[in-house]
Amino acid sequence: MMQHASPAPALTMMATQNVPPPPYQDSPQMTATTQPPSKAQAVHISAPSAAASTPVPSAPIDPQAQLEADKRAVYRHPLFPLLTLLFEKCEQATQGSECITSASFDVDIENFVHQQEQEHKPFFSDDPELDNLMVKAIQVLRIHLLELEKVNELCKDFCNRYITCLKTKMHSDNLLRNDLGGPYSPNQPSINLHSQDLLQNSPNSMSGVSNNPQGIVVPASALQQGNIAMTTVNSQVVSGGALYQPVTMVTSQGQVVTQAIPQGAIQIQNTQVNLDLTSLLDNEDKKSKNKRGVLPKHATNIMRSWLFQHLMHPYPTEDEKRQIAAQTNLTLLQVNNWFVNARRRILQPMLDASNPDPAPKAKKIKSQHRPTQRFWPNSIAAGVLQQQGGAPGTNPDGSINLDNLQSLSSDNATMAMQQAMMAAHDDSLDGTEEEDEDEMEEEEEEELEEEVDELQTTNVSDLGLEHSDSLV
């Protein structure tokens, strides 16, 4: 192989270079020896390049390792501290009642930017995809924080409106106020009794108090102020005229404590007891008088005076009703009902007395003879009346003569005045039930009048009584 390969290179070398033969024979041998390694080196270099072009099918990457690598990339990102701060603010706004405002996060962003600029740190990394992910995450948490702030504002507004509505509707001031000076009110009357004076001066009142099974209970704060409250359960009068009875107290924690007061421990002025008991009994009497449906006399006097001052237009406006309700300590419904009843009971009889109209009376009297017209015609009724001689003061058809009604005009005025006087005595009633009864009576009268009108317009032939002569 060496002998066949050497002549060709030798020829080429000789053709190109004019060199002596001995050096030339050495040179082909050197080229022949050096050429195979060059080919082998070329083959060795090409093999790694082919392997590097296809690394995926040979060795697949573990998903867990890729996830850990992505986590480390997120943790090392320059915007990760800002993302952590925003996430903590969202958690605080969700857990507590005090919501973190969005303005505070704006301040945190400004501080973060200044800190990064002072430390000469970048805001983004070399991976654009990771930078986009961090910016989108910060935007989402920012929107979430704004929504939490809106929800917190709505909750606070709802609570404020609800509390205001409760205070307005329930009248908490009126509910908490106690006119009798209850056991927990600050103006509680102190029942401080001197036992001997009480037994000597007011034995009847003492016997009534000692038999009361309920007693009086006060908190401990009232006892510290010198006011002693006692329950008169199983009270006894021992020797020496002293009073011995157990006392029930309520502590500041709400516990009920029963103690026995020894002889002579209750020493208070008798005059104060008399005043307190008198005021208590007076208030009870006033409450018992304020029954349902009965208005106070001073309230009716105020409303009656307003009614007579406005006879031309006895309809108070809403503002006037509120003013009258404030003066009389009544509700708007009570004031409205009283004026409705007063216009019907007081003003209407006065108008009827001043303008007598006998037509309604004649119509009502005429309706009393309804059975005569219902069961036979007018011709039959006239024949019967002629046989009986007729009733005095009546027409041949059985109706009452209108001339006799003229004498009722004075009676009408008298009855109207009597009704007005009776209404003045009864105007203190609420009158809601009487309104319903009067309306029902008026409806019944209207129905009866309609039936009478229909019967008057009915033909005799419709009743099947055409041959009236045969029936006489």
UniProtKB/Swiss-Prot annotation:
**Basic residues bias locations:** 361-371
Give residue spans, biased composition: Low complexity: 46-56
Query: What range(s) does the MEIS N-terminal domain occupy?
Result: 96-179
Q: Which InterPro entries match?
A: HD, Homeodomain-like_sf, KN_HD, PKNOX/Meis_N, TALE_homeobox
A biological process (GO) annotation for this entry? regulation of DNA-templated transcription
Q: Name one GO molecular function term.
A: DNA binding
Q: Locations of Polar residues compositional bias?
A: 26-38, 396-405
Q: Which is a Gene Ontology cellular component entry for this protein?
A: nucleus
Xref: SUPFAM superfamilies: Homeodomain-like
Principal subcellular localisation of the protein:
nucleus
Q: Where is this region: Disordered?
A: 1-62, 351-371, 386-405, 423-472
Q: Which residues bind DNA?
A: 291-350
| Compositionally biased spans, kind Acidic residues | 429-454
PANTHER family noted in UniProt: HOMEOBOX PROTEIN TRANSCRIPTION FACTORS
| Family according to the record | Belongs to the TALE/MEIS homeobox family.
What protein name does the entry list? Answer: Homeobox protein PKNOX2
Gene from which the chain derives: PKNOX2
